[in-house]
């Protein structure tokens, strides 16, 4: 190729900015004159992204917020598609944010531009008909998890499993003692991490439940200590309110979920992406979740997977206990977690095997997959 390689990327949130910057760095190592255009956050801009508008304009969550910004989002997407068709990049890479990026990929592919989607939406679990749109709009799907790749292979979508960047970042073994010393916790006494979620609704539904379970654990193990990472100042205030009137020996952290996990012996955790982090730190866990009864009723009928937590989806078996809705009682949570504080070997052995599968140098794998799609050498 005589002219410099031009790659368009769009990320819609902070996690996508992290993935995008790693991919850009790996691509630059192979093709130093590559030019990047599209939409990215500060990390992608630091790697040389010429962002058409701030990524924050795409970072919306929740139905109400999306509806309030729908006109702006649709207008930005329309303008972005036209700009990219005019620019004719060698490839477009949509990073996560499927409700925004999949439509862009479809239109660009119809215009003759190669397209890649990085991070699979949860089509294997529900709304499986979305795979038809993915197959039509996507030249290549890059997945972080192996079971996702198997799903796409069965559906006839070109796919490459690249591994998970978290598995590259988190060491195979972590230093529990050093982390406890950093937090001023005893090296010898048992510590349980409580992780009721990062959103206000999750903490509202699970916070008091987790604290009730913690009080029952404390009766059985009087020397027990607890640690809870708060995702934001708002969540910390919410947690402090829920703790009023309780006498739990608990250390609250501002963010730093990795510190809480490195320090603990076991974790009581909300179902979600944090369970993957707990798995990678090899911490035995009990997964719990509660949602509005109607939401639970609807999801039970829509979701095709037998499991809800990532550890079980990755293991393809019931590796960690899942206590959902009415099954998630303080007594059941405490009773299920208690033996894991002493011996979670059956879980952690499985966690280690999964960590090694996911640890594939994801950014470099993704860069090689993109260059192979373009028929370019993997290095100059």
Curated annotation (Swiss-Prot):
Q: Which residues form the signal peptide?
A: none
Q: Which family does it belong to?
A: Belongs to the LpxB family.
NCBIfam families linked to this entry:
lpxB (TIGR00215)
Traced from the root, the source organism's taxonomic lineage reads: Bacteria, Pseudomonadati, Pseudomonadota, Gammaproteobacteria, Pseudomonadales
Q: Under what name is this protein listed?
A: Lipid-A-disaccharide synthase
Q: Which reaction does it catalyse?
A: a lipid X + a UDP-2-N,3-O-bis[(3R)-3-hydroxyacyl]-alpha-D-glucosamine = a lipid A disaccharide + UDP + H(+)
Q: Which InterPro entries match?
A: Glyco_trans_19
The GO cellular component terms are: membrane
The record's Gene Ontology biological-process terms are: lipid A biosynthetic process
Q: Which HAMAP family match?
A: LpxB
Q: Under which pathway is this protein filed?
A: Bacterial outer membrane biogenesis; LPS lipid A biosynthesis
Quote one Gene Ontology molecular function term: phospholipid binding
State a single Pfam family of this protein: LpxB
- According to its UniProt record, the EC number is 2.4.1.182
**What is the purpose of this protein?**
Condensation of UDP-2,3-diacylglucosamine and 2,3-diacylglucosamine-1-phosphate to form lipid A disaccharide, a precursor of lipid A, a phosphorylated glycolipid that anchors the lipopolysaccharide to the outer membrane of the cell.
Keyword entries, A-Z = Glycosyltransferase, Lipid A biosynthesis, Lipid biosynthesis, Lipid metabolism, Transferase
SUPFAM superfamilies, sorted = UDP-Glycosyltransferase/glycogen phosphorylase
């Amino acid at each position: 190729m005589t002219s410099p390689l031009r790659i368009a990327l769009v990320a819609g949130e902070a996690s996508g900015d992290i993935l995008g910057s790693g991919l850009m760095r790996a691509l630059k190592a192979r093709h130093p004159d590559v030019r990047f255009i599209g939409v990215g956050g500060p990390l992608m801009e630091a790697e040389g992204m010429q962002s058409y508008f701030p990524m924050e304009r795409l970072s919306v969550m929740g139905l109400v917020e999306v509806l309030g910004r729908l006109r702006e989002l649709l207008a930005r997407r329309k303008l972005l598609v036209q700009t990219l068709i005019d620019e004719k990049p060698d490839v477009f890479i949509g990073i996560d944010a499927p409700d925004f990026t999949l439509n862009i990929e479809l239109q660009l592919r119809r215009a003759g531009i190669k397209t890649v989607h990085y991070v699979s939406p949860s089509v294997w679990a529900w709304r499986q008909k979305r795979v038809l749109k993915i197959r039509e709009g996507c030249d290549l799907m890059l997945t972080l998890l192996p079971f996702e790749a198997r799903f796409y292979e069965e559906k006839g979508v070109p796919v490459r499993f690249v591994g998970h960047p978290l598995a590259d970042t988190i060491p195979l073994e972590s230093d529990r003692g050093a982390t406890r010393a950093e937090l001023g916790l005893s090296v010898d006494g048992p510590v349980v991490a409580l992780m009721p979620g990062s959103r206000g609704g999750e903490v509202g539904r699970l916070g008091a439940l987790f604290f009730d379970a913690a009080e029952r654990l404390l009766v059985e193990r009087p020397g027990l200590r607890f640690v809870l990472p708060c995702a934001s100042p708002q969540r910390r205030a919410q947690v402090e309110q829920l703790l009023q009137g309780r006498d739990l020996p608990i250390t609250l952290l501002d963010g730093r979920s990795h510190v809480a996990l490195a320090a603990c012996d076991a974790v009581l955790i909300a179902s979600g992406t944090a369970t993957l982090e707990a798995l990678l730190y090899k911490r035995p866990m009990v997964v719990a979740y509660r949602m509005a009864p109607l939401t639970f009723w609807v999801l039970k009928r829509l979701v095709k997977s037998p499991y809800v937590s990532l550890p079980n989806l990755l293991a393809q078996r019931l590796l960690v206990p899942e206590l959902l809705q009415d099954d998630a009682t303080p007594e059941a949570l405490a009773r299920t977690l208690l033996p894991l504080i002493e011996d979670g070997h059956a879980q952690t052995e499985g966690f280690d095997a999964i960590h090694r599968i996911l640890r594939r140098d994801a950014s470099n794998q993704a860069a090689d997959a993109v260059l192979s799609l373009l028929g370019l050498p993997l290095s100059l």
